[in-house]
Amino acid sequence: MNNERYYLLTGAAGFLGTNICMQLLEAGCKVRALVLPNDKSVKYIPEQVEVVLGDLTDAASLEPFFTVPEGCTSVIIHCASMVTVNPNYSEKLMAVNVGGTRNIITKVLNHPECEKMVYVSSTGAIPEEPHGVKIREVNKFTPCDPKKVVGAYSQSKATATQMVLDAVSVMGLKACVVHPSGILGPNDHAIGETTGTLLQIIKGEMPMGMQGSFNLCDVRDLAAGTIAAVDKGRIGECYILANKTVTLKEMCDMLHAECNAKQIKFYLPLDLADKIAAGLEKQAEKTGKMPLMTTFSVYNLARNNEFDYSKAENELGYTTRSYQETIHDEVQWMIAEGLIDGTGVTEKHAEITDGQVSEGGFFQEFDVKEAYQSVEDSVVDTYKKIEDGAVSGYKKVENSFVSGYKKMEAAFVRKFLSREGESVEETKKRLSRK
C-alpha cells in the first residue's frame, strides 16, 4: 500500500512559499503546489514540485489540488494571500484572504486523508500592545479593533485566523496557526516591499530615512518554523515567528558595511513623516499615481514591533539568525541574480505577476527628481505651518508678557512713587522732569 505523504502548498511561487518548497524538497518530501493559471512566477518553483493550477476563490478548482492517490495522506500549508500596503478595504483582498481561506478549510474537512492544516497568518493580525509590552499570541481575533489591528490586510488576516480557530473548535478541523513578522532574505523573485526597500537604499534612491523600527525575519527561518508546525504545532494553537527589532538606520548601516550602499544622512521624525505621507496621499489622489510613501508605511515603523516568540522556540524548535548574516546572503543573491554587481544596480528587474501581488519597496518606485521635489514641497509646507503656528504663538506670548509687565509697572508706581491723588501717568511725567 502506498502511504506516501503529500505536502500541499498554496502560495508556492511567493517569497515564503518558494523557500518552504526548497526546504521540503531537501528533506525528501513530496510537494504539490497550487498556482494561479497564467502565473509567470511558476518558473521560480523548483522543477521537482508537482504544479496544479487553481484559484483560491474558485472552490471547484481546488479539488484536483486536494486529491491524492489512494492510500496516501496529505497535509496543507496555506501560505497564499494578497499583500498590500494600502490600508483601505478591498473586495479582492477579502475574497482572496478570507474567502480563499474558507474554501481551503472546507476542502480539508471534506478530505479525511488531509491530516492537518497550517495556516500562515501574520503578526499584524494580533492586536497591538502599547510600547514597552511584548506582543504575545492570542486566541481571539474578531471583532477587530481598528486601533489595534490597523489596515485592511491585517484585518483580513485576523478574520481568516479566527475562521480557522472556529473551525477547529466547532467542526473538528486539525489545524494550527503561525504568525510571521516581516520577511527578509534571498530568493525574493517578485521583489516585495522589503527587498524593494533594500534595492532603493543600495541604489541611493531613498531620499531620506525615517525613525522607528521593523521586525524582520530571515525567510529561511520562517520557512523552517512553518514546516515544523506541521508535526510539532498543537491543534488550535498559534505561534509567533518573529525576531528582534531593527531600525531603518541600523539596516542602512549594515548595507553600507556589506556593499558600500550610500548612507542616508537625514531620518525624519515619525510625526513629521506621518504629516508628509498624508500630504503625499492627498496629492496622489489628484494625480492618480502611487504616493512616495503612505501613512500605513509610517505606522508600521511607529507601531510596537516587539514580539515574544518564545512559544515557537520552545515548542517548534524555531530559531533566528543574525540580521548581518541575512543581509550578507541577500546581497549575494542580488549579485547572482544580476540585480546588483557589487558596486551598483544593473538594469535587470524581476517580473511582478498577478500571482505575487507586490507594491514595491518602502518608498514606492518613483522618478528621483520628482520624488525629491515632492518631498521637499511637503517638508517646506509642513515646516511653514509649524513656523506660522510658532510665530502666532510667540506673538500671543509677547503680547501677554507686555500686558503683564505694564500692569506690574503701574502697580509698582502707584504703590511706591505716586503722591496722594496722583495718577500713574502724572507720576511718570513728574519723575521724568527731574
Question: Which residues does each predicted region cover?
Answer:
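Active-site Tyr-X1-5-Lys
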Residues: 148-176
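N-terminal Rossmann NAD(P)H-binding glycine-rich loop of SDR-like oxidoreductase domains
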Residues: 5-27
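NAD(P)-dependent short-chain dehydrogenase/reductase
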Residues: 171-177, 181-214
